[in-house]
């Protein structure tokens, strides 16, 4: 098998022959130890215990290394739960890759006897941001600049929450046409009980800071495989300081959304969530309070390396008459880039197509940063 083929996550030589379920594994290990003892090899068995632990995502993550999805906690009450890995590593010739850890368990509920099933995944993608503007905005803005995301610690360019994150890699990993390479991580999953009850149940990453550690570990392995790693590996050493606020119901059409003066929406059946509010990043999400459908996504990005993911898609003309900088207002997304307090700032909008929403947000963010309004007077609503 070539290194570009999809391959299972690496295992220890003898461990790879063991079942992936806990009960089957323990039974076979016990039988092997007894057999070895009976043949005079008990000392060898004792000297080499414990068996090598499974590793996942190009060797970045080790079984039982902290977060629940890598330990027995992932299986709940199921003694036969399984955890499997598959991966394709990036290379110098093909600097894209992916890895996935999948967890499955089925057991009978001790409370009501219903059959319970969980299927969970943690997926990592390594590669450049898309060329097309809409695809790039959908990936980065919709996926990783929501109101529940916060900046990565230690000045790392990216965002994170308890279900995943995005990290922009150093310029040495850029494509020949200048697009940054990013590593993304997402946890997903479902929980089913009985014949009719199903809910979202993402794999447990251990919180936002642990998710940042997992993301950076995968990024370091990916960069090494692709031949673009920096001299020193990226590290997470600080806590997360900028935690997002809780979602809050919007009770009136006159209420300011996400604490932004003058940003009013035309419906009351929504809730807003404010994420980071720093000089480098500001995020806001508005969703339906019953169905969670996105109603409005807003972000300001001034961190240079994170903002680089939008290079080349901000256009050459103002977004509209009287607006500063350059940008476009499309059917699904809007983007504006303008100088603000001595450096470029990028203002983004998703879900809504109303330029007044972006105007209110951009002008409020610009005022907070100490620079001139982005949109002309009267454009906000």
Predicted regions and their residues:
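Terminal targeting segments of Actinobacterial cell-envelope proteins
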Residues: 1-24
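Alpha-helix initiation/capping motif
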Residues: 2, 62, 169-172, 302-305, ...
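Hydrophobic membrane-insertion alpha-helices, especially the h-region
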Residues: 18-44
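Phosphate-binding glycine-rich loops and adjacent basic patches that engage nucleotide phosphates
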Residues: 27-33, 174-181, 185, 323-331
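Extracytoplasmic low-complexity, Pro/Thr/Ser/Ala/Gly-rich segments
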Residues: 43-133, 230-286, 358-381
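Short, solvent-exposed recognition patches
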Residues: 76-160, 262-344, 349-353
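Long, acidic/polar, low-complexity amphipathic helices and coiled-coil-like
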Residues: 100-236
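Extracellularly exposed regions in secreted/surface proteins, prominently low-complexity, repeat-rich
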Residues: 196-205, 209-246, 253-256, 306-381
